[in-house]
Amino acid sequence: MNMEVSSSADEHVAEHYIIEPQEISEMVKPDKTVKILIVEDNPEMRKVLTQIFEQIYEVYTAADGQEGLERASSLQPQMIVSDIMMPVMSGLEMCEKLKSNLQTSHIPVVLLTARNREEHTLEGLQTGADDYISKPFNIKILVARCNNIIQTRKLLQQRFVRNDEPKVEDLPFNPIDKKMLMDATAIVESYIDNPDFDVATFAREMCMSRTLLFTKLKALTGQTPNDFILSLRLKKATEKLRNDPNALIADIAFDYGFSNPSYFIRCFKNAYDITPAAYRRKYANS
């Protein structure tokens, strides 16, 4: 199978390219929970890209940058693959708008650019694109690079879910998303001893709607706002257990916003598969 699609053949690409589903599905495990948005003005190329990615992801399409911008906001896909040269709004302009808007700044964007157009590559990186693929491109490489970005995001989410939070400043997110996570962490920590701190208060302090707060935290950390709050409470509790061997378990529970010690112990064991007392003994002996 000829795996390259050239920019000069865009108008008749379907005539020159036959998609073999088995090759793609063998490369990447299908996951229909992943939404991918393809933004491409050429109908033939849009059809080919759809046929490639629909084998592994849930695919949506847009015919230009303006439509892509609107669909990205409503769909909240896990990935956008976009051509650069399009009518109404270019892929570069769309990418810049996506990456500068808190509602969509977390969505990875891969741009397709013509070969030997280094200015497009530079502009794409400057507008915040996560990757770029030059035409003519190898379909297997396109699929692999898109999948790598998606899997990297999933691995980061799993670290948060496992209460193994990485340092925000070390995360491969853009400045808007890093600031959002740092602000969210600071707000939760400021209410850390308050058992009545809830998602409504969290959203108000973040100056966000509850829906946007949920969308952002879920996309960046894999956690709901309630899970994010709980994980930070537990993380602070583990630090206290390690650093203060004389602190009572009940006092630690109340200090970090748990309404009663029993609830704290249950949450701690669910998260770390060990009780707070056993956790303290483990680190005291290490």
Model regions and ranges:
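Charged docking surfaces used in two-component/phosphorelay signaling
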Residues: 47-52
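Terminal helix-turn-helix DNA-binding modules in bacterial transcription factors
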Residues: 219-259, 282-286
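Receiver (REC) domain active-site loop signature in two-component systems and cognate sites
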Residues: 86
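C-terminal output helix
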Residues: 137-146, 150
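Acidic, metal-coordinating helix/loop segments flanking the phosphotransfer/catalytic sites
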Residues: 61-79, 242-244
